[in-house]
Amino acid sequence: MSAQSPQVRQPPATPTYILRGHAAAIHALQIFHQNLRLVSGDADGWIVVWDLVSKRPRATWKAHDGTVLEVKGFSFGNGAVTEVFTHGRDHKLRVWRFSLQDEESLQKVLPVDIEKTSSTAASQPWLVHSLPVNALNFCAFSMVFLPPDKANTASDASEAPKENTSLSSVLIAVPNALNSGAIDLFHLPQERRICTIPADTEVQTGMVMAANLVISPSGELYVASAYEDGRVMVHGCRGSLQEKDLTQSTKTPWKWEKLYVCRAHSQPVLSLHVSPAGNYFFSSSADAVLAKHPIPSLGSPGHAPEELPIRSINTKHAGQQGVRIRSDGKIFATAGWDSRVRVYSCKTMKELAVLKWHKDGCYAVAFADVDVFEVREKSDEEKPTVSPNDNGNQENQLAGRAETEFSLATVHRQRYEKVQNTHWLAAGSKDGKISLWDIY
Protein backbone atom coordinates (compact mmCIF):
# COMPACT_ATOMS: atom_id res chain seq x y z
CA MET A 1 0.00 0.00 0.00
CA SER A 2 1.53 3.26 -1.10
CA ALA A 3 2.01 6.01 1.44
CA GLN A 4 -0.30 8.98 1.11
CA SER A 5 1.31 12.18 -0.06
CA PRO A 6 1.48 14.74 2.75
CA GLN A 7 0.91 17.55 0.25
CA VAL A 8 -2.70 18.69 0.08
CA ARG A 9 -3.77 18.92 -3.53
CA GLN A 10 -5.86 21.97 -4.35
CA PRO A 11 -9.02 21.42 -6.39
CA PRO A 12 -8.76 22.63 -10.00
CA ALA A 13 -9.84 26.20 -10.62
CA THR A 14 -13.21 26.70 -12.24
CA PRO A 15 -14.54 29.76 -14.08
CA THR A 16 -16.86 32.08 -12.18
CA TYR A 17 -19.03 32.79 -15.23
CA ILE A 18 -19.38 31.62 -18.82
CA LEU A 19 -20.58 34.15 -21.39
CA ARG A 20 -22.31 32.38 -24.29
CA GLY A 21 -23.28 34.51 -27.24
CA HIS A 22 -20.82 34.24 -30.12
CA ALA A 23 -21.36 31.72 -32.90
CA ALA A 24 -17.72 31.84 -34.02
CA ALA A 25 -14.26 31.75 -32.46
CA ILE A 26 -13.34 34.61 -30.11
CA HIS A 27 -10.27 36.45 -31.40
CA ALA A 28 -10.19 39.63 -29.30
CA LEU A 29 -11.14 40.67 -25.75
CA GLN A 30 -10.76 43.73 -23.55
CA ILE A 31 -12.13 44.79 -20.16
CA PHE A 32 -12.70 48.55 -19.83
CA HIS A 33 -14.78 51.28 -18.12
CA GLN A 34 -13.33 50.54 -14.65
CA ASN A 35 -14.00 46.81 -15.14
CA LEU A 36 -17.73 47.30 -15.77
CA ARG A 37 -17.60 46.43 -19.48
CA LEU A 38 -16.10 43.65 -21.58
CA VAL A 39 -15.87 43.90 -25.36
CA SER A 40 -15.36 40.82 -27.53
CA GLY A 41 -14.82 40.22 -31.26
CA ASP A 42 -15.23 36.99 -33.22
CA ALA A 43 -14.26 35.30 -36.48
CA ASP A 44 -17.50 36.36 -38.20
CA GLY A 45 -16.86 40.06 -37.60
CA TRP A 46 -19.30 40.48 -34.69
CA ILE A 47 -18.67 42.75 -31.70
CA VAL A 48 -20.41 42.35 -28.33
CA VAL A 49 -20.16 44.84 -25.47
CA TRP A 50 -21.01 43.00 -22.24
CA ASP A 51 -22.18 44.42 -18.91
CA LEU A 52 -20.02 42.63 -16.33
CA VAL A 53 -22.51 43.39 -13.55
CA SER A 54 -25.53 41.76 -15.19
CA LYS A 55 -23.43 39.53 -17.51
CA ARG A 56 -25.73 40.58 -20.36
CA PRO A 57 -24.99 42.31 -23.69
CA ARG A 58 -25.32 46.09 -23.89
CA ALA A 59 -24.69 46.26 -27.64
CA THR A 60 -24.09 43.81 -30.50
CA TRP A 61 -23.27 44.61 -34.11
CA LYS A 62 -21.43 43.24 -37.14
CA ALA A 63 -18.41 45.51 -37.41
CA HIS A 64 -16.53 43.71 -40.21
CA ASP A 65 -17.05 41.31 -43.09
CA GLY A 66 -14.05 39.28 -41.95
CA THR A 67 -12.47 38.07 -38.73
CA VAL A 68 -11.94 40.65 -35.99
CA LEU A 69 -8.20 40.83 -35.31
CA GLU A 70 -8.36 43.25 -32.39
CA VAL A 71 -10.86 45.31 -30.40
CA LYS A 72 -10.31 48.08 -27.85
CA GLY A 73 -13.02 49.80 -25.83
CA PHE A 74 -12.79 53.10 -23.95
CA SER A 75 -15.28 55.14 -21.94
CA PHE A 76 -15.36 58.92 -21.65
CA GLY A 77 -17.21 61.21 -19.27
CA ASN A 78 -17.55 58.57 -16.55
CA GLY A 79 -19.19 56.15 -18.98
CA ALA A 80 -21.42 58.69 -20.73
CA VAL A 81 -19.80 57.90 -24.09
CA THR A 82 -18.14 54.69 -25.30
CA GLU A 83 -15.73 54.37 -28.22
CA VAL A 84 -14.80 50.98 -29.66
CA PHE A 85 -11.82 50.53 -32.01
CA THR A 86 -12.04 47.43 -34.24
CA HIS A 87 -9.62 45.92 -36.77
CA GLY A 88 -10.87 43.29 -39.23
CA ARG A 89 -9.56 40.97 -41.92
CA ASP A 90 -11.63 43.04 -44.37
CA HIS A 91 -8.72 45.54 -44.29
CA LYS A 92 -10.67 48.10 -42.27
CA LEU A 93 -9.86 49.78 -38.97
CA ARG A 94 -13.00 51.37 -37.58
CA VAL A 95 -13.99 53.53 -34.64
CA TRP A 96 -17.54 53.22 -33.28
CA ARG A 97 -19.26 55.50 -30.78
CA PHE A 98 -22.42 55.34 -28.69
CA SER A 99 -23.69 57.18 -25.64
CA LEU A 100 -25.31 55.83 -22.50
CA GLN A 101 -28.69 56.92 -23.87
CA ASP A 102 -27.99 55.13 -27.18
CA GLU A 103 -27.56 51.80 -25.38
CA GLU A 104 -31.31 51.50 -24.90
CA SER A 105 -31.93 51.45 -28.66
CA LEU A 106 -28.88 49.44 -29.76
CA GLN A 107 -29.30 45.84 -30.87
CA LYS A 108 -28.77 43.36 -28.03
CA VAL A 109 -29.57 40.09 -29.80
CA LEU A 110 -26.47 37.92 -29.54
CA PRO A 111 -24.80 36.63 -32.73
CA VAL A 112 -25.64 33.03 -31.84
CA ASP A 113 -29.36 33.93 -31.86
CA ILE A 114 -29.37 35.96 -35.07
CA GLU A 115 -30.60 34.27 -38.23
CA LYS A 116 -28.37 34.61 -41.27
CA THR A 117 -31.23 36.08 -43.28
CA SER A 118 -31.88 38.88 -40.79
CA SER A 119 -30.56 42.39 -41.28
CA THR A 120 -27.22 43.09 -39.58
CA ALA A 121 -27.09 46.84 -40.19
CA ALA A 122 -29.90 47.91 -37.86
CA SER A 123 -29.28 49.55 -34.49
CA GLN A 124 -25.51 49.83 -34.85
CA PRO A 125 -23.36 52.36 -33.02
CA TRP A 126 -22.30 55.43 -34.94
CA LEU A 127 -19.35 54.72 -37.27
CA VAL A 128 -16.95 57.62 -36.61
CA HIS A 129 -13.89 56.53 -38.62
CA SER A 130 -13.11 53.84 -41.19
CA LEU A 131 -9.48 53.53 -42.30
CA PRO A 132 -8.23 51.22 -45.08
CA VAL A 133 -5.34 49.25 -43.55
CA ASN A 134 -3.40 46.04 -44.17
CA ALA A 135 -4.78 42.88 -42.59
CA LEU A 136 -2.96 40.18 -44.56
CA ASN A 137 -0.39 39.70 -41.80
CA PHE A 138 -2.86 38.67 -39.08
CA CYS A 139 -1.12 41.50 -37.19
CA ALA A 140 -3.52 43.42 -34.95
CA PHE A 141 -3.29 47.18 -34.55
CA SER A 142 -1.71 48.90 -31.56
CA MET A 143 -2.60 52.36 -30.29
CA VAL A 144 -1.51 55.04 -27.83
CA PHE A 145 -3.36 58.15 -26.72
CA LEU A 146 -1.55 61.39 -27.42
CA PRO A 147 -0.71 63.75 -24.53
CA PRO A 148 -3.49 66.35 -24.05
CA ASP A 149 -1.61 69.35 -25.43
CA LYS A 150 -0.40 67.36 -28.43
CA ALA A 151 -3.91 66.05 -29.00
CA ASN A 152 -5.28 69.59 -28.94
CA THR A 153 -2.70 70.74 -31.48
CA ALA A 154 -3.54 67.88 -33.82
CA SER A 155 -7.26 68.47 -33.42
CA ASP A 156 -6.87 72.16 -34.20
CA ALA A 157 -5.03 71.27 -37.39
CA SER A 158 -7.81 68.97 -38.57
CA GLU A 159 -10.53 70.56 -40.64
CA ALA A 160 -13.11 67.90 -39.86
CA PRO A 161 -16.04 69.04 -37.72
CA LYS A 162 -15.81 68.07 -34.08
CA GLU A 163 -18.97 65.96 -34.17
CA ASN A 164 -17.48 63.84 -36.98
CA THR A 165 -14.26 62.98 -35.15
CA SER A 166 -13.34 60.63 -32.34
CA LEU A 167 -13.24 62.01 -28.82
CA SER A 168 -9.63 60.89 -28.47
CA SER A 169 -6.48 61.75 -30.41
CA VAL A 170 -4.43 58.62 -30.98
CA LEU A 171 -1.55 57.11 -32.92
CA ILE A 172 -2.22 53.70 -34.45
CA ALA A 173 0.36 51.18 -35.70
CA VAL A 174 -0.53 48.67 -38.45
CA PRO A 175 1.49 46.70 -41.04
CA ASN A 176 2.46 48.60 -44.18
CA ALA A 177 0.22 47.89 -47.17
CA LEU A 178 3.07 47.46 -49.70
CA ASN A 179 5.91 46.00 -47.61
CA SER A 180 4.62 43.44 -45.12
CA GLY A 181 7.76 43.85 -43.00
CA ALA A 182 7.24 47.59 -42.46
CA ILE A 183 4.94 49.37 -40.00
CA ASP A 184 2.71 52.37 -40.70
CA LEU A 185 1.68 54.92 -38.08
CA PHE A 186 -1.68 56.64 -38.55
CA HIS A 187 -3.23 59.52 -36.66
CA LEU A 188 -6.85 59.85 -35.64
CA PRO A 189 -8.96 61.93 -35.98
CA GLN A 190 -6.97 63.18 -38.99
CA GLU A 191 -7.21 59.75 -40.69
CA ARG A 192 -3.78 60.13 -42.26
CA ARG A 193 -0.48 58.27 -42.21
CA ILE A 194 2.16 60.07 -40.16
CA CYS A 195 5.23 57.93 -40.88
CA THR A 196 6.53 54.46 -41.76
CA ILE A 197 9.06 52.31 -39.93
CA PRO A 198 10.85 50.59 -42.85
CA ALA A 199 11.46 46.86 -42.97
CA ASP A 200 14.87 45.62 -41.88
CA THR A 201 17.33 45.68 -44.77
CA GLU A 202 19.96 43.44 -43.14
CA VAL A 203 17.84 40.30 -42.71
CA GLN A 204 14.66 38.87 -44.19
CA THR A 205 12.32 38.97 -41.21
CA GLY A 206 9.17 38.10 -43.12
CA MET A 207 5.85 39.66 -42.20
CA VAL A 208 5.14 41.75 -39.13
CA MET A 209 3.16 39.50 -36.78
CA ALA A 210 2.64 41.83 -33.80
CA ALA A 211 3.37 45.41 -32.76
CA ASN A 212 2.99 47.46 -29.60
CA LEU A 213 3.34 51.25 -29.23
CA VAL A 214 4.54 52.84 -26.01
CA ILE A 215 5.34 56.41 -24.95
CA SER A 216 8.16 56.82 -22.43
CA PRO A 217 7.85 59.16 -19.41
CA SER A 218 10.07 61.63 -21.29
CA GLY A 219 7.64 61.61 -24.22
CA GLU A 220 9.66 59.52 -26.69
CA LEU A 221 7.81 56.99 -28.85
CA TYR A 222 8.88 53.34 -28.98
CA VAL A 223 7.57 50.43 -31.05
CA ALA A 224 8.09 46.80 -30.08
CA SER A 225 7.52 44.52 -33.07
CA ALA A 226 7.64 40.79 -33.82
CA TYR A 227 8.13 38.95 -37.09
CA GLU A 228 7.48 35.80 -39.03
CA ASP A 229 11.05 34.48 -38.69
CA GLY A 230 10.90 34.57 -34.87
CA ARG A 231 12.69 37.87 -34.38
CA VAL A 232 11.54 40.68 -32.11
CA MET A 233 12.73 44.28 -32.36
CA VAL A 234 12.42 47.63 -30.63
CA HIS A 235 12.59 50.92 -32.54
CA GLY A 236 12.73 54.35 -30.94
CA CYS A 237 12.01 57.77 -32.39
CA ARG A 238 14.47 60.36 -31.13
CA GLY A 239 12.93 63.49 -29.66
CA SER A 240 9.83 64.05 -27.59
CA LEU A 241 6.51 63.34 -29.23
CA GLN A 242 5.53 66.87 -28.21
CA GLU A 243 8.03 68.20 -30.74
CA LYS A 244 6.69 66.15 -33.66
CA ASP A 245 4.56 67.83 -36.28
CA LEU A 246 1.28 65.97 -36.75
CA THR A 247 -0.31 68.55 -39.03
CA GLN A 248 -1.01 67.80 -42.66
CA SER A 249 1.74 70.16 -43.79
CA THR A 250 4.54 68.10 -42.21
CA LYS A 251 7.44 67.22 -44.51
CA THR A 252 10.07 66.27 -41.93
CA PRO A 253 10.55 62.48 -41.77
CA TRP A 254 10.54 60.78 -38.39
CA LYS A 255 13.92 59.21 -37.66
CA TRP A 256 13.66 55.71 -36.20
CA GLU A 257 16.57 53.89 -34.55
CA LYS A 258 16.77 50.14 -34.00
CA LEU A 259 17.49 49.66 -30.29
CA TYR A 260 17.00 45.91 -29.86
CA VAL A 261 16.86 42.83 -32.06
CA CYS A 262 16.71 39.22 -30.93
CA ARG A 263 15.71 35.97 -32.60
CA ALA A 264 14.15 34.46 -29.51
CA HIS A 265 11.84 32.06 -31.34
CA SER A 266 12.25 29.36 -33.98
CA GLN A 267 8.67 29.80 -35.24
CA PRO A 268 6.58 32.88 -36.14
CA VAL A 269 5.86 35.14 -33.18
CA LEU A 270 2.15 35.13 -32.33
CA SER A 271 1.89 37.98 -29.83
CA LEU A 272 3.73 40.46 -27.65
CA HIS A 273 2.73 42.87 -24.90
CA VAL A 274 4.59 45.76 -23.26
CA SER A 275 4.56 46.13 -19.47
CA PRO A 276 2.56 48.96 -17.85
CA ALA A 277 5.83 50.70 -16.92
CA GLY A 278 7.03 50.43 -20.52
CA ASN A 279 10.44 48.98 -19.64
CA TYR A 280 10.07 45.39 -20.91
CA PHE A 281 7.76 43.15 -22.93
CA PHE A 282 6.89 39.48 -23.36
CA SER A 283 6.64 37.56 -26.62
CA SER A 284 4.98 34.23 -27.40
CA SER A 285 5.28 32.09 -30.49
CA ALA A 286 4.09 29.03 -32.36
CA ASP A 287 6.99 27.28 -30.64
CA ALA A 288 6.98 26.59 -26.90
CA VAL A 289 9.21 29.53 -25.92
CA LEU A 290 8.16 32.56 -23.88
CA ALA A 291 10.68 35.41 -23.80
CA LYS A 292 11.08 38.60 -21.77
CA HIS A 293 12.78 41.45 -23.61
CA PRO A 294 14.13 44.88 -22.59
CA ILE A 295 13.04 48.19 -24.08
CA PRO A 296 16.38 50.05 -24.18
CA SER A 297 16.31 53.82 -23.94
CA LEU A 298 17.58 55.97 -26.78
CA GLY A 299 21.32 56.38 -26.20
CA SER A 300 23.92 58.06 -28.33
CA PRO A 301 23.25 58.02 -32.10
CA GLY A 302 24.78 55.07 -33.94
CA HIS A 303 24.84 52.85 -30.85
CA ALA A 304 24.67 49.14 -31.73
CA PRO A 305 21.32 47.54 -30.83
CA GLU A 306 21.12 45.16 -27.88
CA GLU A 307 20.64 41.47 -28.66
CA LEU A 308 20.11 39.58 -25.39
CA PRO A 309 16.68 38.90 -23.86
CA ILE A 310 16.17 39.34 -20.13
CA ARG A 311 14.90 35.79 -19.75
CA SER A 312 13.65 32.99 -21.97
CA ILE A 313 11.89 29.76 -20.99
CA ASN A 314 10.78 26.64 -22.84
CA THR A 315 7.27 25.93 -21.57
CA LYS A 316 6.94 22.67 -23.56
CA HIS A 317 3.52 23.93 -24.67
CA ALA A 318 3.55 25.12 -28.27
CA GLY A 319 1.15 27.70 -29.61
CA GLN A 320 0.60 30.20 -26.81
CA GLN A 321 -0.80 33.49 -28.07
CA GLY A 322 -2.64 36.61 -26.94
CA VAL A 323 -0.08 37.33 -24.19
CA ARG A 324 -1.33 40.03 -21.80
CA ILE A 325 0.29 41.62 -18.74
CA ARG A 326 -1.92 42.71 -15.84
CA SER A 327 -1.99 46.40 -14.96
CA ASP A 328 0.02 45.90 -11.75
CA GLY A 329 2.84 44.22 -13.68
CA LYS A 330 2.88 41.15 -11.42
CA ILE A 331 1.42 38.42 -13.65
CA PHE A 332 0.78 37.74 -17.31
CA ALA A 333 -1.36 35.20 -19.13
CA THR A 334 -1.42 33.38 -22.47
CA ALA A 335 -4.15 31.68 -24.49
CA GLY A 336 -3.14 28.22 -25.67
CA TRP A 337 -3.98 26.23 -28.76
CA ASP A 338 -4.31 23.27 -26.37
CA SER A 339 -7.42 24.98 -24.85
CA ARG A 340 -5.60 25.99 -21.67
CA VAL A 341 -4.99 29.46 -20.25
CA ARG A 342 -1.69 29.76 -18.43
CA VAL A 343 -0.75 32.37 -15.85
CA TYR A 344 2.89 33.27 -15.19
CA SER A 345 4.89 35.50 -12.86
CA CYS A 346 6.28 38.57 -14.60
CA LYS A 347 9.34 38.56 -12.34
CA THR A 348 10.39 34.91 -12.48
CA MET A 349 8.32 33.70 -15.48
CA LYS A 350 7.32 30.74 -13.33
CA GLU A 351 4.02 29.09 -14.26
CA LEU A 352 1.51 29.92 -11.52
CA ALA A 353 -1.75 28.45 -12.79
CA VAL A 354 -3.23 26.43 -15.63
CA LEU A 355 -6.89 27.17 -16.28
CA LYS A 356 -8.81 24.51 -18.18
CA TRP A 357 -12.48 24.63 -19.06
CA HIS A 358 -12.73 25.11 -22.82
CA LYS A 359 -12.71 22.07 -25.10
CA ASP A 360 -11.23 23.92 -28.07
CA GLY A 361 -8.19 26.15 -28.49
CA CYS A 362 -8.08 29.58 -26.85
CA TYR A 363 -7.06 32.66 -28.84
CA ALA A 364 -7.43 35.68 -26.53
CA VAL A 365 -7.20 36.71 -22.87
CA ALA A 366 -7.89 39.97 -21.03
CA PHE A 367 -7.23 41.19 -17.49
CA ALA A 368 -9.29 43.53 -15.36
CA ASP A 369 -7.50 46.65 -14.14
CA VAL A 370 -6.40 46.17 -10.53
CA ASP A 371 -4.96 49.62 -9.72
CA VAL A 372 -7.95 51.89 -10.33
CA PHE A 373 -9.47 51.38 -6.90
CA GLU A 374 -6.88 52.91 -4.62
CA VAL A 375 -8.12 56.37 -5.57
CA ARG A 376 -11.73 55.42 -4.86
CA GLU A 377 -10.85 53.85 -1.50
CA LYS A 378 -8.83 56.92 -0.56
CA SER A 379 -11.68 59.24 -1.49
CA ASP A 380 -14.06 57.15 0.62
CA GLU A 381 -11.72 57.49 3.58
CA GLU A 382 -11.63 61.25 3.14
CA LYS A 383 -15.41 61.63 3.40
CA PRO A 384 -16.36 63.83 6.39
CA THR A 385 -17.69 61.97 9.41
CA VAL A 386 -20.69 63.09 11.44
CA SER A 387 -19.81 64.91 14.64
CA PRO A 388 -21.83 63.75 17.71
CA ASN A 389 -22.44 67.38 18.65
CA ASP A 390 -23.97 68.53 15.36
CA ASN A 391 -27.19 70.21 16.59
CA GLY A 392 -28.05 67.21 18.72
CA ASN A 393 -29.26 65.30 15.65
CA GLN A 394 -26.92 62.35 16.00
CA GLU A 395 -29.74 59.88 16.59
CA ASN A 396 -31.69 61.04 13.55
CA GLN A 397 -28.57 60.95 11.40
CA LEU A 398 -27.74 57.41 12.49
CA ALA A 399 -31.26 56.29 11.71
CA GLY A 400 -31.10 57.93 8.31
CA ARG A 401 -27.74 56.36 7.63
CA ALA A 402 -29.04 52.90 8.54
CA GLU A 403 -31.96 53.37 6.19
CA THR A 404 -29.64 54.48 3.40
CA GLU A 405 -27.36 51.49 3.85
CA PHE A 406 -30.20 49.14 3.08
CA SER A 407 -31.61 51.16 0.23
CA LEU A 408 -31.71 49.78 -3.30
CA ALA A 409 -29.21 52.40 -4.41
CA THR A 410 -26.68 51.14 -1.91
CA VAL A 411 -27.24 47.52 -2.94
CA HIS A 412 -26.79 48.58 -6.56
CA ARG A 413 -23.55 50.40 -5.72
CA GLN A 414 -22.24 47.41 -3.79
CA ARG A 415 -22.89 45.14 -6.77
CA TYR A 416 -20.92 47.48 -8.99
CA GLU A 417 -18.03 47.76 -6.54
CA LYS A 418 -17.84 43.99 -6.15
CA VAL A 419 -17.48 43.58 -9.91
CA GLN A 420 -14.97 46.42 -10.12
CA ASN A 421 -12.81 44.94 -7.37
CA THR A 422 -12.77 41.43 -8.82
CA HIS A 423 -9.48 40.39 -10.40
CA TRP A 424 -11.09 39.15 -13.60
CA LEU A 425 -9.25 37.13 -16.21
CA ALA A 426 -11.32 36.62 -19.35
CA ALA A 427 -10.49 33.95 -21.93
CA GLY A 428 -11.98 33.56 -25.41
CA SER A 429 -12.03 30.26 -27.27
CA LYS A 430 -12.67 28.70 -30.66
CA ASP A 431 -15.96 27.40 -29.22
CA GLY A 432 -17.34 30.96 -29.12
CA LYS A 433 -17.55 31.03 -25.33
CA ILE A 434 -15.88 33.45 -22.92
CA SER A 435 -14.81 32.19 -19.50
CA LEU A 436 -14.42 34.63 -16.58
CA TRP A 437 -11.99 33.63 -13.85
CA ASP A 438 -11.33 35.29 -10.50
CA ILE A 439 -7.66 34.65 -9.68
CA TYR A 440 -4.78 36.36 -7.86
Curated annotation (Swiss-Prot):
<comment type="subunit">
    <text>Component of the ASTRA chromatin remodeling machinery complex.</text>
</comment>
<feature type="repeat" description="WD 6">
    <location>
        <begin position="406"/>
        <end position="440"/>
    </location>
</feature>
<dbReference type="Pfam" id="PF00400">
    <property type="entry name" value="WD40"/>
</dbReference>
<feature type="repeat" description="WD 5">
    <location>
        <begin position="315"/>
        <end position="354"/>
    </location>
</feature>
<keyword id="KW-0539">Nucleus</keyword>
<comment type="function">
    <text>Component of the ASTRA complex involved in chromatin remodeling.</text>
</comment>
<protein>
    <recommendedName>
        <fullName>ASTRA-associated protein 1</fullName>
    </recommendedName>
</protein>
<keyword id="KW-0677">Repeat</keyword>
<dbReference type="InterPro" id="IPR001680">
    <property type="entry name" value="WD40_rpt"/>
</dbReference>
<keyword id="KW-0853">WD repeat</keyword>
<keyword id="KW-0156">Chromatin regulator</keyword>
<dbReference type="GO" id="GO:0005634">
    <property type="term" value="C:nucleus"/>
</dbReference>
<feature type="repeat" description="WD 4">
    <location>
        <begin position="264"/>
        <end position="303"/>
    </location>
</feature>
<dbReference type="InterPro" id="IPR019775">
    <property type="entry name" value="WD40_repeat_CS"/>
</dbReference>
<dbReference type="GO" id="GO:0006325">
    <property type="term" value="P:chromatin organization"/>
</dbReference>
<feature type="repeat" description="WD 1">
    <location>
        <begin position="21"/>
        <end position="60"/>
    </location>
</feature>
<feature type="repeat" description="WD 2">
    <location>
        <begin position="66"/>
        <end position="107"/>
    </location>
</feature>
<comment type="similarity">
    <text>Belongs to the WD repeat ASA1 family.</text>
</comment>
<dbReference type="InterPro" id="IPR015943">
    <property type="entry name" value="WD40/YVTN_repeat-like_dom_sf"/>
</dbReference>
<feature type="repeat" description="WD 3">
    <location>
        <begin position="205"/>
        <end position="245"/>
    </location>
</feature>
<dbReference type="InterPro" id="IPR036322">
    <property type="entry name" value="WD40_repeat_dom_sf"/>
</dbReference>
